[in-house]
A protein has these predicted regions:
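Alpha-helical segment proximal to the catalytic Tyr-Lys
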Residues: 123, 167-171, 230
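Short C-terminal tail/terminal secondary-structure segment
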Residues: 222, 233-257
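Canonical Rossmann dinucleotide-binding motif of NAD(H)/NADP(H)-dependent dehydrogenases/reductases
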Residues: 2-33
Length: 257
């Protein structure tokens, strides 16, 4: 077990997938946990599985909704020490097929929502003079990838947002970091790579020989909020099993992208 402060945690986008795994990991470590999501049904199911959780339905693309959610979470949790932003949406389309509606909707969730949640929660976290913010980003915003320009642009924007806050938040002893995974077993991966053949081809590109799992992200998130992670600040941590390093040959076979 990490030497964790077990202070209250708010996870935005935690009703399913990666966010849910993060919430369950923090619960296991003894934290007071609140989860926010737009998915009312997912929140209801999560609450049935973990009655000790606090849940709040919110639309992160709405500043008013975020304000109300953060205020309620701060009050009912007894404070917010750590914010984890795991909300996100994607759709894989060629650039010429991405219309303005999809562009705006994706940035509203992935970038504006992040800004809103930090804007609303930072006063509470900074007042404590300790705490952290962890953003679940995307490694493909570093490496680039075909299809989904609106998604990668929004995730790259999150990098800039994080870096711009390093000095200001650090002055209040609040740390901010981004976890940048690439291929993680999730609903989002199933959307982008719907067949087992595609998933196997993808796995062949990863030096460690497997796809990432939600618990890989949950464990790193826990570390970043722990005492052991207290000197990590302003970092983009690429979590991809070595995929970004793609050698020309692997075990006698040519590695194709």
């Amino acid at each position: 077990m990490l030497a964790n402060d077990q202070k209250p945690v708010l996870i935005v986008g935690g009703a399913q997938g990666i966010g849910k795994e993060i919430a369950e990991r923090f619960l296991k470590e003894g934290h007071r946990v609140a989860v926010s999501d737009i998915d009312e049904q997912g929140l209801s199911l999560l609450k049935k599985q973990h009655s000790e959780l606090l849940t709040f339905q919110a639309d992160v693309s709405s500043w008013e909704s975020v304000q109300q959610m953060i205020s309620a979470a701060e009050r009912e949790l007894g404070g917010i020490a750590h914010l984890v932003y795991s909300a996100g949406m994607t759709k894989s389309l060629p650039f010429l097929e991405v219309d303005f509606s999809l562009w705006k909707k994706t940035l509203a969730v992935n970038l504006y929502g992040l800004y809103y949640c930090i804007k609303a929660s930072a006063p509470y976290i900074c007042e404590r003079q300790e705490g952290s913010i962890v953003v679940i980003g995307s490694g493909s915003a570093i490496t680039g990838s075909g299809g989904g320009i609106q998604y990668y642009a929004s995730k790259a924007g999150a990098f800039g947002l994080m870096r711009s806050l390093v000095k200001e938040l650090g002055a209040h002893h609040v740390r901010i970091n981004v976890i940048a995974p690439r291929v993680i077993e999730s609903q989002m991966l199933d959307t982008l790579y719907p067949t087992e053949v595609e998933k196997r081809q993808l796995q062949s590109l990863i030096p460690v020989g497997r796809l990432g799992r939600p618990d890989d992200i949950a464990g790193l998130t826990l570390f970043l909020t722990s005492d052991e992670g207290s000197y990590l600040h302003g970092q983009i941590i690429l979590l991809d099993g070595g995929r970004t390093y793609q050698p020309k040959y692997t075990e006698g076979k040519r590695a194709e992208r």
